[in-house]
């Protein structure tokens, strides 16, 4: 009799575990979110900045109970090295092996564009936090799985054209662009928006990644009469441009896209970087909102950042922080980690989220997958190796 009761107890316990085990596991398992970014090489600062913003937001949400009734968020980081082919492999790995609910993207437009077909095939939301290529979000897909809390080249080019002509009073720009899909995206936008101001570039020059000297391109722009160089480059090549400008003895002002802030630009150029002006979406200098103060405090406690002048690649952190919160809100609204449901929720987020960069009220729609526009950009300048707002 005792033996029978003992066996019956074991059977009942086993039955209970079988019946409730998967459900309990599903309820308590962390919700994984992926990051595909360059966390090594010349643009590693961008990847590190993005990772910091994501982790600060994740810790904040987890401290308040997580999502979906208590599930913690967990970040899975993969280094795409700015390599499109590796980015595609990573995209599949994050979704198929790691089973992430969404993926955040890094600095390189070339990588992001290569990954776009994968997100749509696997029905996984992508949230850009840096790469600005226009066609990342305007990709012609319906439904569209690519979203962004970052700059969009089309908006950036409009902003730069207006700043150059209205603020700097320059009417003879020369474009110096990297020879990639990102450079091509900006060539189209800059030509369009400067044209809208009644201005035509005196020359359009290209360079390849790792080119050691930009003197020939700069001399051609100088001889063409350029009174401003509009630069589209990441940190390694941007540094070569600034060094080459000094080499040819040309004191022309440089107005740049923000790629130069994603690496060791100031370290590689020293005082030569002073005065180079470029766009950002956020600055940790000046009076901060309560959320800005919180993020700075977390940067200090978690990463040893002593002040705004030590915040590396600040837009990476700011964009990623806001982007993570919007994705978490979408997961909560969808009541699911299913990619299609999260995507639908992103397009119809309820209420308002007061973020670091701005207050977001329905930041995405079926036709608009960029949460930020040119109304959200600011101009900054390199001074003494630090990024400070233009006065």
Label each region the model flagged.
Residues 2-17, 24-391:
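Extracytosolic ligand-binding ectodomains
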């Amino acid at each position: 009799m005792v033996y029978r009761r003992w066996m019956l107890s074991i059977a009942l316990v086993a039955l209970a575990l079988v019946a409730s085990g998967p459900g309990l596991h599903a309820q308590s398992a962390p919700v994984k979110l992926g990051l595909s970014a360059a966390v090594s090489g010349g643009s590693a600062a961008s990847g590190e900045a993005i990772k910091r913003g994501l982790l600060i937001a994740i810790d904040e949400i987890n401290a308040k109970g997580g999502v979906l009734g208590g599930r913690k968020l967990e970040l899975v980081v993969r280094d795409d090295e700015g390599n499109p082919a590796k980015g595609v492999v990573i995209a599949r790995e994050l979704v198929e092996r790691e089973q992430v609910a969404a993926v955040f993207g890094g600095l390189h437009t070339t990588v992001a564009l290569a990954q776009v077909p994968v997100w749509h095939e696997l029905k996984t939301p992508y949230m850009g936090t840096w790469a600005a290529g226009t066609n990342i979000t305007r990709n012609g897909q319906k439904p569209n799985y690519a979203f962004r809390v970052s700059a969009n080249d089309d908006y950036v080019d409009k902003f730069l054209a207006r700043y150059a002509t209205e603020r700097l009073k320059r009417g003879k720009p020369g474009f110096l662009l990297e020879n990639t899909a990102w450079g091509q995206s900006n060539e189209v936008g800059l030509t369009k928006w400067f044209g809208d101001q009644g201005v035509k570039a005196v020359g359009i020059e290209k360079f390849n990644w790792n080119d050691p000297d930009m003197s020939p391109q700069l001399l051609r722009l100088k001889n063409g009469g350029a009174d401003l160089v509009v630069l589209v480059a990441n940190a390694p090549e941007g540094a070569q441009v600034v060094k080459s400008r000094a080499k040819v003895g040309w004191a022309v002002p440089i107005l740049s896209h923000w790629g130069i802030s994603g690496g060791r630009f100031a370290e590689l150029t020293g005082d030569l970087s002073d005065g180079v002006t470029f766009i950002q979406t956020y600055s940790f200098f000046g009076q901060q909102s309560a959320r800005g103060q919180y993020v700075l405090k977390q940067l200090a406690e978690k990463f040893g950042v002593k002040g705004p002048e030590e915040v590396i690649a600040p837009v990476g952190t700011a964009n990623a922080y806001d982007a993570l919160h919007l994705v978490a809100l979408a997961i909560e609204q969808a009541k699911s980690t299913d990619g299609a449901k999260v995507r639908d929720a992103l397009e119809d987020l309820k209420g308002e989220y007061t973020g670091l960069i701005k207050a977001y009220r329905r930041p995405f729609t079926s036709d608009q997958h960029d949460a930020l526009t040119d109304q959200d950009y600011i101009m900054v300048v390199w001074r003494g190796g630090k990024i400070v707002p233009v006065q």
